[in-house]
Amino acid sequence: MRYWMLPVALCACVTPTSSAPGPATGSDVNLVSAFPTGAASPIESGWLVAKTMQPRQGAHPPEQGSEALTQAPSAEPAAAPVVDVPEAPLSADGPALLAQQILSRPELAAYHGWIRYLEFRAAHASARFADQPGAVVEDRLRLAQWTRKILDNPNVLRELRGVTEWAYLSPVDGSGQPFKLNIPSDYDPAHPLPLSIELHGRSGNHLEDADMREHAGYFELSVLGRARAGSYRALSEADVLQVLDYVSQHWAVDRSRVHLVGGGMGGTGALWLASRYPQLFASGRTVCGSASDKPLGNLITVPIYALHSEDDYRVPVLHTRGPLAKLLALGGNVTLEEPNGYGHAVWKYEQGTARADAWFPQQVRPESREVKRLDFTALDGAAVRAYWAEIAEWGPEPKPAHFALKVGSKNRLEARLDNIRSLHLRLAEAPFDADQPLRVNIEGAPVLNVPAPLPAELWLEHVDSSWTAAESGPVAPFRLHTPGGANQLYDGEPLLIVYGTHGDAATQAALRVAAGAASRSSNASWPKPARDGGNDGVAYNQNLYGELNIKADVDVTPEDRAQRHLVLIGTAEQNSVVAALAARLPVRLEGDELAWNDGSRSSARDRALGLVHYNPDAPSRLIFWVASNDAAAYAAGSLAPELLGALPSGADAVVVRVSDPTLVASRSFDSRWRWLSRDQSALLPAELAASSADLARAVAAAVRRAAPADFALAGLPEPARTSAYEPGEARLADLLAQNYFTPVSVMTLLGSELVAAAHAIAPSDGVLEPELDLSRIQPQREYRLALSARQISPFVRLTHLAPRKYEVVEGDVARALSRYGVTGMPSVPAVANRATPPALATSR
């Protein structure tokens, strides 16, 4: 066991023994609209719903230094007169009528999500639990009991104590999304208490993974995140943030002591959320989680306590060992315990769990004015802020944006900015003396002098190759563009999926199928149902309590167009909403051609288009348009939504072949929605584009040179993004977009281990680059092997190798490709072995 106790958490991750009820299927389409405020929209039952939450415009903490961190919540459920409603019988109509009364009363808005959730459970219990009549009766009885309880006592929310299931009303679709909350026995609204947010593992849910018991001192919160396997990204991520807002609104939470904890997928999610919103969280405790694909500098203000068994082959220990060593080197606060013998069940390591549980209450999020150093990388437009600094406008390249800021003596700010056109500084929240001049030294630029008294806010702007300081930020008639792909529509704001109703019968059926697949996903991809699922028949990768809202194009209202992000399915001929926008979109489907507004044209035969763009009718909202003349493009698992929605992407448009999973081309915008030229990017050699194996070797060669390393791993992608690229059309830019922020690491292996690894990965089409020459490998010599974050898990599962000498290196796959390309791969001599980071310097 290795144990680092350094200046920097998790509780037990419980393996689920059963699965809870889940989302609607097929025909159960929810057409309710929760917007605008006070507006009511009918659904099948005729019930009404009112808006209770504002859409999230990024995740911001309460104002630093204000009483918001300590005062009792100001927006508890308002006292309301008890309605004299006759006792309703337990029937289909009785609870429904009482629920309708609650949902139609704005002063009972705090209960709308809970009622919506109970309605869903009651309505779908028979279909999901036909063989469990007791469960069916229980769900229906719970709706009847709670509607009566709320109408009899509108302040019942204030009186809840102990462990309870609850739900909030999601602004995404008006559904009730559940969570479990432990309200401490000593809770007093006048005295805010800490909050620990638990994120469940894959196959789990908010009820089963959180082993909550009544106690005093702090709140516990377990969040579903839309699906059992939502990975706490896209809508699953938004769910956590919106539940946090809801709980903080209705209970007195100390926002300076909000902690994340999770195991497996939940541990990975805890690190993901902490890296995206460091200003929100006081600590992170993770069991067998992965930090491999996280911007590690983002975590320097968030203490981390990690437990990971050395023999975990489901989520290999390398996913924490290397990244957390890198975080430590960056100045982070990290504790890592690596016992052995627990596999993926390291929550059974009682001593480590006890230490982590004792550690986290001591962690307090720093006040904004105490934070003198920030090192933040933004991957998309949903998470662009760290404490007092925020990206106001992206730079010109389709890659992540980064700022590194350090406050020095005498009101001096040292700044290193990459791919940023405008950086917003909240000086009133920063550690500067407002009565003294500010000197800003941006790397490579003349010093900027800001006279005293300092403004509350300042924007650093890059204009005409020079930096200036201004007291106002960028202005545009549309929402500014940010990279990241179609998941930016899945940020917690209102969302509507719109399918076309025009064309032949087969096309219309395909469009409806596509809408159904999209409605069951918590992100912009349209995945096929996972093979595994709960005892309710819901696949782990599908929304558990309600599909996303769907409408036919002919039913879309002006309010829908103005207030929602829109997923548009179909061509202008197939979808009338697309037809109304087509002339103002940057690409059009004209017969057998795609016409781009920069004058370029390309074939549309056997091809599908995916596009992310602002909505011309509502410039603050986004659209995600998927279109093809071939109905086969609208099947679940289609490549265009996969490429733009499964992971962050540098592409804003993709053209894919329909007949097989091949990427033809991708395109990206600058911050003002102007196409970046493809002509400046080199064509992929035809022989590489046509062969995924050869292309993988070429990518590995670039990674090996950049690391540097003796060998690099080729193949074993996880997940596979595409099988091939279109010869004669695909360019290096397409490869870069699909490797958007893919970190690289290097492990050190003995020659004997390297040979054994090569044999172990060969049956799975994994190879080493350059090819292993057994006659030249010395068994006891050390060799450096480079691999990407996506290759770690399959490599360790096949080889069972998790070497001590393992480090995350600077740069990523895209940077390696930008520097070395995929042509001309001269052999590079074996490199000298560099020293291992101090924290990892242990014997083999």
Locate predicted features.
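Short beta-strand element of the alpha/beta-hydrolase
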Residues: H191-R202
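Primarily recognizes the serine-hydrolase "nucleophile elbow" in alpha/beta-hydrolase
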Residues: S256-I300
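Short beta-strand/loop motif that positions the catalytic acidic residue
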Residues: A306-H308
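C-terminal catalytic histidine-bearing segment of alpha/beta-hydrolase fold enzymes
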Residues: Y313, L318-I420
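Solvent-exposed alpha-helical segments and adjacent loops
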Residues: E414, R426-E429, D435-Q680, V813, ...
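Solvent-exposed loop/linker segments at secondary-structure transitions
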Residues: D491-L496, G500-S525, V538-G546, A562, ...
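Gly/Ser-rich "nucleophile elbow"/oxyanion-hole loop immediately N-terminal to the catalytic nucleophile
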Residues: S185-H191, R233-G264, R276-L280
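A domain-start/cap signature at the N-terminus of enzymes
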Residues: A80-L193
